[in-house]
Amino acid sequence: MRALGPGSVSSFLKTILDVVHYALWVLIGGALVFALVSLLFSFNPGLLADRVPFGERFAGLVERGPAFATVLVAGAAYMGGVLAIVDILRRIFVTLTAGDPFHPDNVRRLRLVGLIFGGLEIGRYILAAVLALMMTGQVRTVEGTLNLTTWFAVLVIFVLAEVFREGARLRNEAELTI
């Protein structure tokens, strides 16, 4: 089985990325709708009280509605970052399917994937701090771990971008050679 070109593994992966792309749009829309609904219920808990018996299990949800909405909006933003990464990867796989892996635009695309991936991790740290503030009402040290796997992946992506840059340079030199 070939790695590049039409009918190859790269074209199969491009199809999978297309499906994930549209699924992420649906998930983002759903998260934003649920965030809006949770905010509406936190401001007016009697909105559906007559029609839907929530019981005691959901009594705490009214007080924590804004925090729940914050988590949903942050989740939608995170999925938006993942959507951006998937969209960039789709463009990279278009060049792989065309048999042109060292296209000069792929260098920029890989660097952008690394930046977005790192930004998502920093956003995760910020969300943990904001939620700690919202839940306790006071600024405190956030218990969390530095995800070394994620930061290693970011570094690998930047190294791959440099490998692609060198490949594009060599391809350009080969095109100039008679």
Q: For each predicted feature, which ranges?
A:
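Alpha-helical transmembrane segments of polytopic integral membrane proteins
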Residues: G29, V33-L36, V82, V86-R90, ...
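Hydrophobic alpha-helical transmembrane segments of integral membrane proteins
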Residues: G99-L133
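Membrane-helix interface/capping segments
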Residues: R2, V82-P101
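Short, Lys/Arg-rich, polar N-terminal cytosolic tail immediately upstream
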Residues: M1-F12
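Membrane-helix boundary elements
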Residues: F58-V86
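Alpha-helical transmembrane segments of multi-pass integral membrane proteins
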Residues: G119-I178
